Every structure is written in C-alpha cells, then in structure tokens.
C-alpha cells in the first residue's frame, strides 16, 4: 500500500486535481468494452479467413505507408528552404539585370514592434539602414537580436556602420565598411552584434 500511495502522490504532484487521473482511468476502461465487442465481430469473419494471403498483404501495406509520410514532410521543409534561396537568387539576378538606382531605406525604430516592418522590407529585397538612437538599450538589443535571426533565415547581411547604426541588406548586396575610429574624447556607448559593451 505504501508504494501505491507514493505513486498516487507522484501523480497528484503533476496534476492539479486528483480527479483528472480517475477520469482518465474511466475513459480508458470504457474503450476496453468496445474492444471486446470487436472480437465478437471478428468471430463471424473467420469464414472469410479462408483467403489469408490477401489479408496479410493488405495488412503489410499500411505499415510501409506511414514510413514514407515523414519523409515528404522533411522533403517539404527542405523544398521550402530551397525555394526561398532560389527566390533570393532570382531577385538578385533581376536586380543585377535592371538598370535602376538602388535605394537604402533609413529607419529609426522607436519600439520593438517596428522590427517586423524592417524584416518585411528585407523580404522585398530592400536595403535598410537602422539607427537605434531612439530606443532604449534593452529594446535595441531585442530588436537587433530579432533582425539578426531574420537576416540568418533570409540569407541577408547585417553590418555595423556606427555605434547605434546597422545596415541590413539582402543577399545580392555587398557591403564594404571601413573601420571608423572616433576621437578619444567622444564618449559613445558601442555595441557588438550581441550588444555587449565593448569597453
């Protein structure tokens, strides 16, 4: 009895109400009754079991079918990634062929929620210059982390341009930034990609 009490206490620990386990036990016991009725239905069918070869073959076929189903799901996820990269390369070729001026959108986000708008611009194959000067340090860290994740998924580039400015570009744009040194008397809090203080 003490072992049973320990198990009951263990189950009660993970459930808020002890009645839930009793309800589950009752639902389990109820399906057991219909299972008993199914064998009764199977008993009249032994007459048809004189043809055992088609039945085992039919029973063997459903088992291989569930195994190929997970593989198409894996293939579909890799196909989605492949389509995304193909779309990015298609946009890169289209932009290379077109003789249009490349514009860079400048954004001054004030809230973390504006990061999704910036990612939408990246999806539209736009370059975005982001200045975090109007955000608090914590919000800027969150926003930069979100944008870095989006950049990784969309195969873009994220470069630090100034102490609070970052350039987010699609895959087809190459950015060469020289290291800009500020005079020693200017105090500006600088952050790396992980937004840790570099001092």
From Swiss-Prot:
GO terms for cellular component: cytoplasm. It is found in: Cytoplasm. InterPro entries: Cell_div_SepF, Cell_div_SepF/SepF-rel, SepF-like_sf. One of its GO terms (biological process) is division septum assembly. Keywords: Cell cycle, Cell division, Cytoplasm, Septation. Residues 15-79 are annotated as: Disordered. Homodimer. Interacts with FtsZ. Belongs to the SepF family. Cell division protein that is part of the divisome complex and is recruited early to the Z-ring. Probably stimulates Z-ring formation, perhaps through the cross-linking of FtsZ protofilaments. Its function overlaps with FtsA. This is Cell division protein SepF. It comes from Streptococcus sanguinis (strain SK36). The lineage of its organism: Bacteria, Bacillati, Bacillota, Bacilli, Lactobacillales. The gene is sepF.
